[in-house]
Amino acid sequence: MTVKIGVLALQGAVSEHIKALKDSGAETIAVKDASQLEELDGLVLPGGESTTMRRLMDKYGLFDAIKIFAKKKAIFGTCAGLILMAKEIEGRKGPHLGLLDIDVKRNAFGSQVDSFESDLKIDHVAESFDGVFIRAPYIKKVGPGVEILSTYNQHIVACRQGRFLACAFHPELTGDTRFHEYFVKITKENK
C-alpha cells in the first residue's frame, strides 16, 4: 500500500524531507496551500524557525487546517516541527498545535554555533543513528501515552504519541532514511 505524505513547504529542508520520503516508498508533495491537505495520508512539519513558521501558517490559512487534519492523520515534526506540535513551550504563551502531550524548551542546546551531531539509539528505528542538532529543542516532560524514543545526555529528543512522531534533530540531513521509513509505517498503520 502506498501512502501520500506532504511536507509543509514554508521553511526548512523541504526537498531533503521529500527525497527521504520518496526513498522510503511514499508518494510525496510540497504543501503550500491548505486545500492540498485533503489528498494526504500524512504530513511532515520540517525544521526552521518555529515563531516564523507559526506566523506563516496563520498567513496562509494552514494553522487551523493542520489542526483539523491532525484529528485523523499522521504527523511527523522535526526540530521546529516538534515545537509546533507541543502542548507546552517554555516561555511561550498563545495557541500552538498542541498535538503532543509534551513540554519543550526551544534552543535548548544553545545557538547556531553550538550545533552538533551525535550518535543516537532510537527505539523502533535504529541502534545507531546520526542525530544532527541545529539550534535544537529538547522535550522537558512527557504526558501519559507519550513514548520516549530517544535521549541525548538525559534529555528527551524523540517521541511518539499514537500517529504523531517528533524529534529534536534533523534526520532529513543525514541520508539515512530509517526515521522516515518509520513514519511511513505509522502513516500506513493509520490509513
UniProtKB/Swiss-Prot annotation:
<keyword id="KW-0378">Hydrolase</keyword>
<comment type="subunit">
    <text>In the presence of PdxS, forms a dodecamer of heterodimers. Only shows activity in the heterodimer.</text>
</comment>
<dbReference type="InterPro" id="IPR029062">
    <property type="entry name" value="Class_I_gatase-like"/>
</dbReference>
<feature type="binding site">
    <location>
        <begin position="48"/>
        <end position="50"/>
    </location>
    <ligand>
        <name>L-glutamine</name>
    </ligand>
</feature>
<dbReference type="GO" id="GO:0004359">
    <property type="term" value="F:glutaminase activity"/>
</dbReference>
<feature type="active site" description="Charge relay system">
    <location>
        <position position="172"/>
    </location>
</feature>
<dbReference type="GO" id="GO:0036381">
    <property type="term" value="F:pyridoxal 5'-phosphate synthase (glutamine hydrolysing) activity"/>
</dbReference>
<dbReference type="GO" id="GO:0042823">
    <property type="term" value="P:pyridoxal phosphate biosynthetic process"/>
</dbReference>
<dbReference type="InterPro" id="IPR021196">
    <property type="entry name" value="PdxT/SNO_CS"/>
</dbReference>
<dbReference type="GO" id="GO:0005829">
    <property type="term" value="C:cytosol"/>
</dbReference>
<dbReference type="InterPro" id="IPR002161">
    <property type="entry name" value="PdxT/SNO"/>
</dbReference>
<dbReference type="GO" id="GO:1903600">
    <property type="term" value="C:glutaminase complex"/>
</dbReference>
<feature type="active site" description="Nucleophile">
    <location>
        <position position="79"/>
    </location>
</feature>
<keyword id="KW-0456">Lyase</keyword>
<protein>
    <recommendedName>
        <fullName>Pyridoxal 5'-phosphate synthase subunit PdxT</fullName>
        <ecNumber>4.3.3.6</ecNumber>
        <ecNumber>3.5.1.2</ecNumber>
    </recommendedName>
</protein>
<keyword id="KW-0315">Glutamine amidotransferase</keyword>
<feature type="active site" description="Charge relay system">
    <location>
        <position position="170"/>
    </location>
</feature>
<dbReference type="Pfam" id="PF01174">
    <property type="entry name" value="SNO"/>
</dbReference>
<dbReference type="GO" id="GO:0008614">
    <property type="term" value="P:pyridoxine metabolic process"/>
</dbReference>
<dbReference type="GO" id="GO:0006543">
    <property type="term" value="P:glutamine catabolic process"/>
</dbReference>
<comment type="similarity">
    <text>Belongs to the glutaminase PdxT/SNO family.</text>
</comment>
<feature type="binding site">
    <location>
        <position position="106"/>
    </location>
    <ligand>
        <name>L-glutamine</name>
    </ligand>
</feature>
<keyword id="KW-0663">Pyridoxal phosphate</keyword>
<feature type="binding site">
    <location>
        <begin position="134"/>
        <end position="135"/>
    </location>
    <ligand>
        <name>L-glutamine</name>
    </ligand>
</feature>
<comment type="pathway">
    <text>Cofactor biosynthesis; pyridoxal 5'-phosphate biosynthesis.</text>
</comment>
<comment type="function">
    <text>Catalyzes the hydrolysis of glutamine to glutamate and ammonia as part of the biosynthesis of pyridoxal 5'-phosphate. The resulting ammonia molecule is channeled to the active site of PdxS.</text>
</comment>
